[in-house]
């Protein structure tokens, strides 16, 4: 992400309000792509359904199906996204670009094989019709490929191409939905699901074309990345736990007193979901700032510091470089926290006026949820920034510990809050996010207090290679692929 941050930084050097707005627009879409696209599509589809006079139960079921598909796909990809990103970074550093495309298809295939049967089984017993289930499964498969592709797209630094794929997906989904439902008279639920699936499908094709334009095709093993999953297993659980902590409170509230059974196993809690959806947008400030400010300003100091160890720098230069790096890091983290604080305070002061202007039917309970979740998401955003810095310093144990605390506390405390008045439901996530922030902060402070020891003293004396279940799976798949090649050669 630092690479694309440097590209986006060029936009911020241009003067003028329009240039700044365009730069922040690019950064916001790229940095929070999956969730932002989901939010825009959800809100747009609701407006379109209201415009055509769709029954409320159909609207609720449509939102539930898209939300379930989105969360299922993000959960599956969250386990593999960080190890795959690490593999991608290592291959680019070693100038082995020919391994990139095979790993993209290998990782995507594995996620599809793991995720589609599980989600398909859920759809079978969920109460959805056959057509609705097939459309949801199709959308799920597209989302898996898209979210996996986001890790690869940031490497090519083509932010305009990424932006165009997002805009094209939204335009096609809305346009096709209007044609199917308004002009052709198709059923609202099935027509809009098909339109959304086509929109995500266009984005998938667009992104794959971008990848093929930048990376060469080759016969390299598509399963080599699995060794990275074993070698960096804490990264996999860091991604999974962060995802669980971020979304568990929503699922728990669906099953709580404010939840409503829409159809079969599809539940929703509009009084909680809508405030959470809008409150989530407040973290855009920190997400954008991390890429275009924290990483861009911190990374050169970070690279210089570690290059002194690799290139035989003298002790005095190393000490000076460490002081400069940590000074820049502390300054950027402080500015990030202040920006998020001001953004949250501004939203809280204006939310009563602005939200009442929207046709969302906010009541006092929803306003309370919104205020609570705004603070919670703000703490999460800053805590997630600290988590990313821990990953920069390869403190994978500290990162997975912070993420695990977040997942356990946010989910556990939200479940505990179900025994109290509904007004307290959002506090479980808020406290979990606060603990996430504090654990990450204290861990980063402890880790950087003795950085030379962390860099040198904790390294293994001899090289270690971890061979676990994923490595064995990769060897098995590669052996199977080699056997098929031999059979084809013999036949020819």
Where are the language model's segments positioned?
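N-terminal membrane topogenesis motif
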Residues: 1-42, 60, 64, 226-235, ...
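Small-residue-rich midsections of specific transmembrane alpha-helices
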Residues: 63-89, 243, 247, 276-301
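Specific pore-lining/lateral-gate transmembrane helices of multi-pass inner-membrane transport
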Residues: 92-104, 273-357
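Hydrophobic alpha-helical transmembrane segments
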Residues: 165-212, 423-445
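Hydrophobic faces of transmembrane alpha-helices in multi-pass small-molecule transporters and flippases
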Residues: 20-36, 163, 221-248, 333-342, ...
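Transmembrane helical elements of multi-pass membrane transporters/channels
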Residues: 195-199, 203-295
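Alpha-helical transmembrane segments of multi-pass membrane transporters/permeases
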Residues: 153-179, 390-412
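Alpha-helical transmembrane segments of multi-pass membrane proteins
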Residues: 67-72, 108-113, 121-153, 343-349, ...
């Amino acid at each position: 992400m630092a690479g694309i941050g440097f590209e986006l930084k060029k936009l911020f050097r241009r003067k003028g309000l329009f240039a700044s707005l365009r730069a922040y627009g690019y950064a916001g879409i790229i940095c929070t792509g999956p969730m932002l696209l989901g939010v825009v599509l959800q809100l747009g589809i609701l407006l379109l359904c209201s415009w055509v006079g769709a029954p409320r139960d159909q609207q609720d079921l449509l939102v539930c199906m898209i939300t379930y598909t989105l969360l299922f796909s993000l959960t599956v990809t969250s386990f593999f996204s960080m190890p795959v990103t690490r593999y991608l970074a290592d291959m680019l550093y070693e100038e082995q670009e020919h391994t990139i495309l095979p790993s993209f298809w290998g990782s995507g295939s594995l996620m599809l094989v793991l995720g589609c049967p599980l989600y398909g089984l859920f759809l079978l017993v969920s109460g959805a019709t056959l057509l609705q289930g097939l459309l949801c499964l199709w959308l799920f498969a597209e989302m898996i490929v898209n979210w996996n592709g986001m890790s690869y797209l940031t490497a090519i630094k083509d932010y305009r191409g990424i932006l165009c794929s997002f805009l094209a997906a939204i335009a096609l989904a809305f346009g096709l939905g209007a044609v199917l439902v308004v002009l052709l008279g198709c059923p609202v639920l099935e027509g809009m699901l098909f339109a959304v699936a086509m929109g995500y499908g266009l984005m998938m094709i667009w992104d794959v074309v971008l990848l093929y334009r930048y990376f060469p095709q080759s016969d390299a093993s598509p399963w080599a990345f699995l060794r990275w999953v074993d070698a960096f297993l804490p990264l996999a659980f860091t991604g999974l736990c962060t995802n669980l902590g971020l979304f568990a409170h929503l699922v728990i509230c669906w099953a709580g007193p404010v939840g409503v059974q829409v159809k079969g196993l599809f539940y929703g809690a509009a009084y909680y979901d809508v405030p959470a959806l809008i409150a989530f947008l407040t973290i855009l400030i920190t997400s954008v700032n991390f890429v275009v400010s924290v990483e861009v300003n911190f990374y050169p100091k970070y690279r210089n510091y570690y290059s002194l160890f690799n290139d035989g720098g003298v002790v005095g230069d190393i000490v000076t470089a460490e002081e400069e790096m940590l000074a820049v890091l502390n300054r950027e983290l402080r500015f990030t926290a202040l920006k998020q604080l001001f953004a949250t305070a501004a939203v809280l002061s204006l939310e009563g006026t602005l939200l009442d202007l929207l046709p969302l039917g906010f009541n006092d309970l929803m306003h309370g949820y919104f205020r609570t979740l705004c603070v919670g998401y703000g703490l999460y955003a800053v805590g997630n920034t600290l988590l990313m810095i821990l990953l920069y310093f390869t403190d994978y144990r500290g990162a997975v510990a912070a993420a695990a605390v977040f997942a356990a506390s946010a989910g556990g405390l939200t479940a505990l809050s179900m025994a109290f008045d509904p007004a307290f439901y959002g506090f479980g996530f808020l406290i979990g996010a606060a603990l996430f922030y504090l654990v990450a902060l204290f861990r980063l402070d402890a880790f950087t207090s003795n950085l030379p020891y962390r860099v040198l003293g904790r390294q293994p004396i001899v090289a270690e290679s971890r061979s676990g279940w994923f490595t064995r799976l990769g060897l098995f798949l590669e052996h199977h692929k080699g056997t098929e090649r031999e059979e084809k050669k013999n036949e020819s």
